[in-house]
Amino acid sequence: MAKQSYTEKDIQVLEGLEAVRKRPGMYIGSTDSRGLHHLLWEIVDNSIDEALAGEANFIQVTIHKDNSATVTDNGRGIPIGRHKSGRPTPEVVFCTLHAGGKFDASGGYKVSGGLHGVGSAVVNALSSIVEVRIRRDGKEFYQKYEKGGSVIRSPKVINYSGHRTGTEITFKPDPAIFSTTRFDNNIIKERLKESAFLIKGLKIKLDDERHGTSDTFQFKNGIIEFLESKTKGRKSFHDALFFEGTREQISIEVAMQFGSEAYGEDIVSFVNNINTKDGGTHETGFRAGLTRAFNDYARMKEFLKDRDPNLEGSDIREGLTAIINIRIPETILQFEGQTKNKLGTPEAKSALESFVNERVGFFHIFREFRVLSVFSFKVRNTRNEPQEECY
């Protein structure tokens, strides 16, 4: 095999959005269906961030017949003035990597899922067409980008007399990048329903013009309803437990329930409305706090004697269904990778461990009549003793 030459001329510098098109997997994980939907999540998450900031209470997602998608919210709208670079601010956001208002506490968001500032630009880079429409400050701004952002149309700005504000983004994934450009209605419904569960009162509507279907999601009781939807039809030891509070700048919500028949554990966690499918420091802290609370209580009530070893965490969590929903300020937020599947914030471990240990322990002491059967079941199971039937 002939040797290939390697000289100075072989060194390439990929600038701007060209780098995203060259290596899309670095930004969205893959170019299959999962990566395709990741584009939609990037735009939806920007609208979710407006809701997290208390600036939006409605999000509309529309899948068009040509498999383009439109996401609209009634938030503040992306700023439309001139950026210090001399370009329109929306153009900077959609055509420049690492541009946005989510890098520090002085920006427009105290809490958000958009940590890296590449989401909107990545969507532009991997789409054949992107259209941006913004209503803000008595103006309506419109701009169109084509061919992965390589063609930038001049913006149009007109006076707007209405009271409605917000951002509307339409994009069409580039078939030259993706192995499929067909959005899956069921995947989108599941994700939007999750988001509505996580922000009490937020209304999210999904219209799919391909099928002529429309779905609306809104939940006044938040993750309690989320938990109930996951445990519906199952026998359990107790009603759903719900705890909320703040530790180390981190806002925490936990809903949990122990089933009397289920095996294994089902823990679903979210950080700033991002589903952390691979877990992270918050789940580690949750498990540690739960294990400590159970063992402390078991010894206090003498379910465990001095000679007995502690219950193992895996035994305690058997039959557990839990929803963990936390919000972390941008100043300490750390995800492992652009796809944000795993939390890396160190403070989350200690925050969740102390919070869960305290709240679960508090609940045990003051409402123990609801959980005594759980402890009896766990201890008997660990000792391989015969189980009494539980309802």
What are the residue ranges of the model-derived segments?
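Bergerat-fold GHKL ATPase/HATPase_c domain
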Residues: 1-41, 92-94
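GHKL-type ATPase core
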Residues: 2-9, 67-89, 100-229
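Extended, well-ordered alpha-helical scaffold/bundle regions in very large, multi-domain proteins
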Residues: 313-379, 383
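Conserved ATP-binding N-box helix of the HATPase_c
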Residues: 34-57, 119-124
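Extended active-site and interfacial segments that coordinate phosphate-rich ligands
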Residues: 76-79, 83-100, 144-161, 183-190, ...
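Core mixed alpha/beta domains of very large multi-subunit molecular machines
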Residues: 43-56, 68-74, 78, 384-391
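A conserved short beta-strand within the histidine kinase catalytic ATPase domain
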Residues: 57-63
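GHKL/Histidine-kinase-like ATPase module
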Residues: 153, 186, 193-195, 201, ...
